[in-house]
Amino acid sequence: MAKDDVIQMQGEVLENLPNATFRVKLENGHIVLGHISGKMRMNYIRILPGDKVTVELTPYDLSRARIVFRTK
């Protein structure tokens, strides 16, 4: 998949789910399932409910996202 195809959006983590998965509410009101990207997992970045995150969505499945950045 090319990097041009991704859609980046801001969101807020609502809850933790098993296997490093999170329920994220996007700024447009949609709720998606998000998983942590590999770089965040390697650097042990912790994500808690209430954190603001940047997610990447693909045009193929808009119900799932990849969490790529956690803002402070």
UniProtKB/Swiss-Prot annotation:
InterPro entries in the cross-refs: NA-bd_OB-fold (IPR012340), RNA-binding_domain_S1_IF1 (IPR006196), S1_domain (IPR003029), TIF_IF1 (IPR004368)
GO CC annotation terms, alphabetical: cytosol
Extent of the signal sequence: none
Subcellular location(s) of the protein: Cytoplasm
Keywords: Cytoplasm, Initiation factor, Protein biosynthesis, RNA-binding, rRNA-binding
Keyword rRNA-binding: yes
Main location: cytoplasm
GO MF annotations in UniProt: ribosome binding; rRNA binding; translation initiation factor activity
Protein's UniProt keywords contain Protein biosynthesis: yes
Pfam families in the cross-refs: eIF-1a (PF01176)
Residues annotated as transmembrane: none
Coiled-coil blocks: none
Ranges where the S1-like domain occurs: 1-72
CDD domains noted in UniProt: S1_IF1
SMART domains xrefs: S1 (SM00316)
Function according to Swiss-Prot or TrEMBL: One of the essential components for the initiation of protein synthesis. Stabilizes the binding of IF-2 and IF-3 on the 30S subunit to which N-formylmethionyl-tRNA(fMet) subsequently binds. Helps modulate mRNA selection, yielding the 30S pre-initiation complex (PIC). Upon addition of the 50S ribosomal subunit IF-1, IF-2 and IF-3 are released leaving the mature 70S translation initiation complex.
Subunit structure: Component of the 30S ribosomal translation pre-initiation complex which assembles on the 30S ribosome in the order IF-2 and IF-3, IF-1 and N-formylmethionyl-tRNA(fMet); mRNA recruitment can occur at any time during PIC assembly.
Database matches in NCBIfam families: infA
Cited HAMAP family: IF_1 (MF_00075)
Recorded family membership: Belongs to the IF-1 family.
Protein name: Translation initiation factor IF-1 2
Species the sequence originates in: Cupriavidus metallidurans (strain ATCC 43123 / DSM 2839 / NBRC 102507 / CH34) (Ralstonia metallidurans)
This protein's encoding gene: infA2
